[in-house]
Amino acid sequence: VKDLLARGDRVTVLTRDVGRTQAALPGARVVSWSSDRPGPWFEEVDGVDGVIHLAGESIVKRWSEDARREIVRSRIDTTRLMGEAIGKAKRKPGAFLCASAVGYYGPQPGERVLDEDAPPGEGFLADVVVHWEEAARAVEEQHGVRSVQLRIGVVIGEGGGALDKMIAPFRFFLGGPIGDGKQVTSWIHRDDVVGLTLLALDNEAVRGPLNVTAPHAATGEEVARAIGAVLRRPSWLRVPEAMVKLGMGDAAEIITTGQRVYPRRAEALGY
């Protein structure tokens, strides 16, 4: 939002917490959003240049039945609801950008390189992302609005993203790779998430899935070694995979597995 405002765009933010959001983004117009039902916010998509839909419950927690339902609802159902709002707009938006995830590809062997044409993987997260993207594509199929699905990797950056959680053990000299450290992390810096999102918003040739990752993925061992070097902390203390699974259940796949995703389309666009 801050980058859009900085370049002179007028931005409306739909949120469930108007007061907090307005305080954080004083230059934006902030409107109350109901994530589970139509409301006055439907009118906000009328005539805009683009809608960027980023809603989604955190997946980094144990997947109880309630958690699974909320992960699905907060992604698929809200995307369908946004599509309903776009369908009712008299002047359709120029584009609909919807967050997605590299979880689309499911857990994969580290040597396999996955671009946007790779098929979906298997498992709970992969199934969620497949249906999430179907809901996003329906906006274009039903309403003729250009749709882009942003398959975002592990986001890092100072003061946000996954980095804070990744470095916490290192501060207490407890850092190291998980398991054998061979699982691949398809990461991206927060600034590049913004850059690729703006590229997709502005470039009318961009539609469909877009891998939002750095071109060079890293193994868990490489990530641990890099964090240790920057913080001047040891990075050799391995965390047993069984311990992670005991604490997180099925959700442990987020940490113990990975996929080597390549941003072929972004590279072809010159990013």
Model-assigned labels for residue ranges:
Residues 100, 134-158:
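Conserved beta-loop-beta element that borders a ligand/cofactor-binding pocket
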Residues 253-271:
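C-terminal amphipathic/interface module of NAD(P)-dependent oxidoreductases
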Residues 203-250:
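Mid/C-terminal beta-alpha module of Rossmann-like enzyme folds, strongest
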Residues 19-78:
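NAD(P)H-binding glycine-rich loop region in Rossmannoid oxidoreductase-like domains
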Residues 70, 80-123:
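Conserved Rossmann-fold NAD(P)-dependent oxidoreductase catalytic core, especially the SDR/UDP-sugar
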Residues 145, 156-165, 200-210:
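Glycine/proline-rich active-site loop of Rossmann-fold NAD(P)-dependent oxidoreductases
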Residues 165-192, 199:
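A conserved pocket-lining segment of Rossmann-fold NAD(P)-dependent short-chain dehydrogenase/reductase
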Residues 119-125, 152-160, 180-190:
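Glycine-rich "substrate-gating" loop/helix at the edge of Rossmann-like oxidoreductase active sites
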